Amino acid sequence: MQRVHQLEPGDVQRLIDAALAEAHVDEAQVSLAVVDGGGHLLGFHRRPGASTASAEAAIAKARMAALTGQDTAAMESAINGERPALLQLATVLGQPAAAMGGGLSLRFADGLVGGIGVSGMTPQRDAAIAAAGAAALPIWPHLEAVSFSCGDAEACAAFFCCQLGFRRLDAIDPGPDYAALVGLPGAQLKLVRLALGQEHLELLEVRELAPGQRPGRPFPSDARSNDLWFQHICIVVRDLNQASAGVREGIASGTIAPISSAPQRLPDWNTAAAGIEAFKFHTPEGHSLELLAFPTGKGDARWHEKSEPGVFLGIDHSAIGISDSNRSCRFYDELLGLRLGGDGVNHGPEQDGLDGLAGTQVRITGHRCPSGAGIECLDYRSPSGGRPMPSDLKAQDRAHGQIRLLVGDHAEQLEELAAQVESYGGQVLSPGVITLPAAAASQLGFRAGLQIADPDGHRLQLVVR
């Protein structure tokens, strides 16, 4: 069963507080209302000096936005333009039309969860106050970063920056609590943090192991795309031929190992993926990467914005090898709150060439966050022989990848997830929820974390701010 998102009391108060903070800037005499997806009132506030009429109008605006899924300013423009019949909605919905600025629909994970209405000032000012409130809507789950374990994080960072357009942010010692979170208590770690577009990549290097901890292992030399430890990041590019030029030179010189036989264009019969161009390869340390160019009409709208500079645009998703699509859908969508963003089977010579396999049939399910990067699950039906995740995989091993997901704003949410992980086929790896000291929390961008494994062993770091 898909998770149905709804506004919680804490969400409602957060929206109202944010709107009130904006109204306080000019002491706006307004009323504020928040309703659920059915138009039922969840929260209300009337500022000093706000009229009785503003109270009724704020509720009407919120209800209209929620029940129609449209912002009331857009409805006003439509009614004044080519669609005056929209006024009949007032009769259909049994409430005032409220076709004036100040009512905004509230969406979460592409679903309508309610509306916020503000009234008492000009329509433009009402709309600005409502927008400040709507901006406080929680944005989780959100993929905060992907992490790869490296033997030499600085050398890996140089590769990503020189070859793939990443920018270096910083290098930090994440501290002992973070080391305990990733399963290496007492070890000395280094995190080199990179960014591409809106997304972040962390390169983890173990500088010194604690007594009794074994050395890290390299990738198996015979690793294949259908092994269950497989994980790549998909880097969206504007032009695949231009973006892959340096990589192809590295392959020719022997410094980079290919996965794909050559850049591939997915066939027209595959409606969901037709026209996508992609190329997979390994970094010098063995991590798997994909360069991908979306044709017009596919992928997030941001990948087609002309204002985005450069050839390398950002990270669309991290793909992971799995053994049971239905089980992984339950884990990622029901438990963690992502949404199913695509489901299909790729096969044929183009997929063989892309994955470096023969006779490929792979079911691909995409799992998306409300915004930003997502997770893609690769369930290879053919060829057989994909090997499971090593049961003793540790953070010092090159095959150790990690996806950090922001899942809330208080530690109790992590406790609730920890209690459910095993029932969805996963495993809690950290010694419970680990709360970071203030300095580490400020440096890392989260204040508490829980380390888990999905049903196939892929590492996830669930965090709250």
Predicted regions and their residues:
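Flexible, solvent-exposed loop/hinge segments and secondary-structure transition points
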Residues: M1-P138
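Short beta->alpha transition motifs characteristic of CBS
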Residues: F44-G49, I116-T122, L291-G297, R381, ...
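Exposed loop/turn and edge beta-strand positions of beta-sandwich/beta-sheet ligand-binding modules
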Residues: M100, Q188, W229, G275, ...
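Short, solvent-exposed beta-strand edge segments and adjacent coil->beta transition regions
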Residues: V113, P141-A145, L228-H232, I315-H317, ...
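Vicinal oxygen chelate
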Residues: P138-I139, F148, A171, H200-E202, ...
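An N-terminus-focused feature that recognizes amino-terminal "leader" regions
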Residues: W140-Q163, R167-V237, N241-S253, S423
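Core segments of cupin and vicinal oxygen chelate
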Residues: S149-H200, T271-A274, G321-G374
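Flexible internal linker/loop segments at domain or repeat junctions
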Residues: A358-G359, I375-D397
